[in-house]
């Protein structure tokens, strides 16, 4: 696996990993809040690698990317991060695959740069708005109850909340070794970063109907963090989106049922490639 350091928005250094076939169709994976590129290990080290170029970035403030104190409220910075990875690695019309908070970053990119450089969009257990009653209506009370711990500077309180978060992600609980790997990269994200992520307030209701590239929305039917009703929010703005409900999965279907997830993602990427020249893109 290759690693890269890319200068993102405002010069923040981003950690990026790459696996798979350099000549294959490209997927850029964008993880959720407090996670890291390691969340995608069951994609990066899978049968997808045979035919696809697989790239995963650590968001600013996460993983091995730089963690500035105050650089999380500006949509343009997030957009610049994604654009920088596309440019630095010369990604050829990637499918952008975002989990949980990741779709917000994808939409930041689309707002500022349009969709002419991408082939398609994949939302996984994702949200598209923050800081409003409509945004909060699709977030579970169990997750909301953990927010004080996410923001706590007391180590024990923070770790307890993050472990509870991880357990909420899964219907079938991960092994102890997997759980504590995940906990490690969650704990590496400072509380001020989580504060910055969730202090943003915006919706993308104006942007979603303008998207013309193919969209796949994957949602675990047993998601205990983002309620499955979020799909109705997405469909209101993305009438052309494909909807994939995974009946036995929770918030992380790419981990819990990676084989089925990867198969569906592969088919979507192939469809995006076939459609790449067939539809006009938003500017």
Where do the language-model regions lie?
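Gly/Ala-rich beta-loop-alpha elbow adjacent to hydrolase catalytic centers
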Residues: 98, 102, 106
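Catalytic active-site module of serine/aspartate enzymes centered on a nucleophile-bearing elbow/loop
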Residues: 241-283
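Conserved acidic catalytic loop of the alpha/beta-hydrolase fold
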Residues: 77-94
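Flexible "cap/lid" loop of the alpha/beta hydrolase fold
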Residues: 107-153
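Alpha/beta-hydrolase fold catalytic core
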Residues: 1-29, 49-52, 91-92, 119, ...
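Conserved serine/cysteine hydrolase catalytic core
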Residues: 192-236
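Conserved HGGG/HGGXW glycine-rich cap/lid loop of the alpha/beta-hydrolase fold
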Residues: 12-68
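Conserved alpha/beta-hydrolase catalytic His-Asp/Glu region
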Residues: 132-138, 152-209
